[in-house]
Amino acid sequence: VIRYLGYGKQFQDFKCNVHISGRQGPAGIKSVLPGLSPESRNCITIENDEMSWGIDASLELWQDCALVLDIHHHWVKTGEYISPADDRLARVKDSWRGVRPVIHYSVSREDYLVEHCATTKPNYDALLEHGYKKGKLRAHSDMYWNSAVNEWAVSFAEDFDIMCESKAKQVASIDFYNQMYQKDISSVLNNIVDSA
């Protein structure tokens, strides 16, 4: 399908994201890459997951395909708010071969962390100690309700495009942008739609 849409002619002119999962992990992905079409190899990205195969496993593939760092998955797997200065991110960036890299961003559901302060980053270990379940912390929120977590996510924007993953999709993405940059981009988006 990607080829028929005209993509895959250049490295990362389109993104087809695959979560690194399954029993074989990086070895399984490495074994199937040679059998993919050139268009598929140009478009595939591999994303760390929150269960079995984290960032370190993803980095085994950094010379084979572009890596997408999902910062929420990393937090759910490790409890760490990874820093944009973390040494591992240099290899994530290098995997993109000069193309601007992408991270994925989401936050735990607002209807699960109901009592949590919206201006303080959730402490993963404290949440687990208080009976919150890892499986429920994985779920994506409707909106980007936590300003402290949002500010952490934006700290990656100098080097990465941020792909928003939320249940409210574009509404949440626009609200996130407006919160972080104190600008209302609705009029810009309306002008783009009107001129199309």
Where are these regions (language model features)?
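Histidine-acidic metal/acid-base catalytic patches
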Residues: 65, 76-196
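Active-site flanking residues adjacent to catalytic metal/cofactor-binding acidic residues
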Residues: 46, 69, 164
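Active-site acidic/histidine proton-transfer and metal-coordination neighborhood
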Residues: 1-66
